[in-house]
Amino acid sequence: PLYMDVVTALANAGKNDIKVIGGRYGLGSKDTPPRSVFAGFEELTKAEPKRQFTIGIVDDVTNLSLEEKPAPLVAPAGTIACKFWGLGGDGTVGANKNSIKIIGDHTDKYVQAYFQYDSKKTGGVTISHLRFGDKPIKSPYYINKADFVACHNPSYIIKGFKMVDDVKPGGVFMINCQWDFDELNHHLKADAKRYIARNNIQLYTINAIDLAIEIGMGKRNNTILQSAFFSLAKVMPEEQAIQYMKDAATHSYLKKGQDIVDMNHKAIDLGATAYKKIDVPADWANAVDTKPAKELKGKPELVKMVKDILEPVGKMDGDSLPVSAFVDHVDGQFELGASAYEKRGVAVSVPTWDSTKCIQCNQCAYVCPHATIR
């Protein structure tokens, strides 16, 4: 509508020699980062720019999309960008909201936070985008390159999520896992290894999973990981951050008892030193995947849909899909039975049936929506 208004206004004024182009953005609720905006301005420099265009998507059907190149960093100097990949319900989002409040209340820095959730909500993927800086932050878009990226669930590494691609050269990548180096070397994909080695990424691991169980916090390891973040990101002096975190924990949990408060204080103290730096091998720069790609079986049209659409979307890489991937699904209908291919493996531990303790009440069979015990 704005394009039509401008063209009409110029035509009514008799100024027909002015070149006007217009485009659409935010299609399908897509993010609009600086590289998309830069693509629009670059199109204007061409002798014959497209009158109508789209940005933010790869439109290989109508060919109206513009080529997007990596844009220069436009944030003010000194702005620190952090990105956290969590699991819905694990406390990552709550901890990051707490971090933003601590930094905003106790420093002179400007703060900004965006949070992404997938459709599964609890148990689904969450991505937290935090920015801190000494100057006002005018970045109404998600973080594309971060100084600090944290993976709070090891299954994302196994599945091949492209998290490390978000780290700036020389930045920090922290993985929450129970693995030693050999296991980490086995699970990391070759493209992630190459990026880490070639861009001098500072790689850290932290076993907040076992540490939380040891302290008595169960699955709630967000406090440990939050403490590790403040220690590694250097957004503010570590001692101050730890004290502010303890004050916040006391305020939040005192009504639940002093034991809960002490437990959180212990988690904060331990988390600040629980991480380990990984010495990145030089041969990672030329790493190649030796494991063959998993072969999917089933109806050809279903397998095609799983490979072309379901798998990239499951890895939070759906924004990279071209329009042509959906040509066979223009009416919104998709093949049935795709859930059989979606094995997310997000659980750190799985239950086993102990026949010596089972009284055969059958409650587990009818409570479980998948009746896995059967």
Predicted regions and their residues:
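C-terminal non-catalytic interaction/assembly regions of soluble proteins
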Residues: P1-P34, F38, K46
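Short cysteine clusters
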Residues: G271, W353, C358-C364, C368
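Internal, active-site/partner-interface "lid" segment
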Residues: I21-G23, G28, P49-E67, M236-L254, ...
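Active-site cofactor/cluster-binding pocket
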Residues: P1-M4, T8, A13, G78-G88, ...
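Short, charged low-complexity linear segments at domain edges
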Residues: A325-T352
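Iron-sulfur cluster-binding cysteine motifs and their immediate structural context
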Residues: G337-S339, Q363-R374
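Active-site phosphate/pyrophosphate-binding segments
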Residues: K30, S36-K109, Y117, K121-T122
